[in-house]
Amino acid sequence: MSKSRVCYCFFIFLISFSFNVYAESSFIDALTGGKIDFGIRLRYESVEDDSKASGNRDADALTNRTTLGYKTGSFHNVFAHIEFENVTDILDDTQYNDGENGLTALPVIADSRGTEINQAYLGLKFIDKTTIKIGRQALTPRKAPFHRFLGTVLWRQNWQTQDAVIVTNTSFKDTEIMVGYIWKNNTIFGTDRDMEAPIFNAKYDGFRYAKLEGYYYDLDFTESADLANASTTYGLRAHGVIPVINDKTKFIYTGEFARQSDTGSNSNSYDADYYLAEGGFKVKLNNFVTSILVKASYEVLETDKGTQGTVFRTPLATGHAYQGWTDNFLLTPAAGIEDTYFTMVATGKYDTKLIVSYHMLEAESAGFDYGDEIDIWLTRKLNKKYTVGLKYAVYDASSDAGNTKASDLSRFWAYVGYQY
């Protein structure tokens, strides 16, 4: 063999060896150079539910939520994320109904015990400004707490996730488009629900005083117990902030409309609407209270025929954020619901926040009131990693004839959390 051929072969070997070493090194770097996420939330919850029989109206729970996850770095535009979640009941879980233990005579505290894989997905970035995620993941097209149609139910200890393939693209200026397909909903109770659900969400932020969102969610639940939730929803949302007087005072607004109809094997034929209108002001201050937001809101979930099967429903939402924190209206009543409510958010120094809201809840298609609710939440962050909070919600039922929510209900929480 000639010296030139020997040199050539040796050169090819060197390149191949170097590439393999580099590839292996890059893979190891991506695998080990990721980010760990770790969180703990210890929480006490107390409930008084007058709809239960005497002697079974009070319930208490002390639970702890622990999450441990890891997101790898990118290797040839591929990355992965896995997260484990554990919910432990520190007291006796026979003191409340967690939604899975069968203690239906007791008030509900929806924090069931268990350990599970909360998220596990593969991410791909082969196309510019496009991310594909395949696997179990948290879907939140909107920032918390505005998860009206898709959310994680992040207030509960066991979060909701979806098994899905999701494509997100930001190629167009000021535009984010999300297209996906969900085949399984993993609930807060540790159970799952099969579905065939193409989804679409598009947001545009190019206007100075308005942000626009359009969406289409075709949630075809396929198991017999969930067929009433099979629905197609499409809608539009606009919200924005407009300076008034000076940059320290701003007008805030939101307007939203959605229409929903039955789909798949849902035996209930219906068409129902959703709409939201709200406006208020946010003012920046220069004392202990750094800002105050006040707003008035009006939200309606219609019923088509006055039956439970023909109401506007949101089965994948973070329902806790709507119609009051007592969770009395997670399922839209047969008569629909109108919620007129007022909210005050005060932000202070030392990462302190106070939220107070007052709800006036009425039937949408009948002439009676459900009741009123007052919600109060005080929270503070410490060193950016620790959070402490107190939260109280009380529902005062109306005595109107026909009221299907005629029992008083109150909840109290105290919690401390850590997030790394």
Task: Describe these PLM feature segments.
Residues 26-49, 76-82, 175:
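Transmembrane beta-strand segments of Gram-negative outer membrane beta-barrel proteins
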Residues 37-41, 65-69, 119-123, 133, ...:
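One-face residue pattern on beta-strands with alternating periodicity enriched for small/polar residues
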Residues 128-132, 152-307, 342, 347, ...:
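Signature for the C-terminal beta-barrel architecture of outer-membrane proteins
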Residues 34, 116-118, 161-163:
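Envelope-exposed proteins and targeting segments
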Residues 13, 20-36, 305-318, 325-337, ...:
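Outer-membrane beta-barrel biogenesis signature
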Residues 1-8:
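Bacterial N-terminal signal peptides that target proteins for export
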Residues 408-420:
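Outer-membrane beta-barrel "beta-signal"
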Residues 45-64, 72-121, 126, 139-156, ...:
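Surface-exposed loop and membrane-interface regions of Gram-negative outer-membrane beta-barrel proteins
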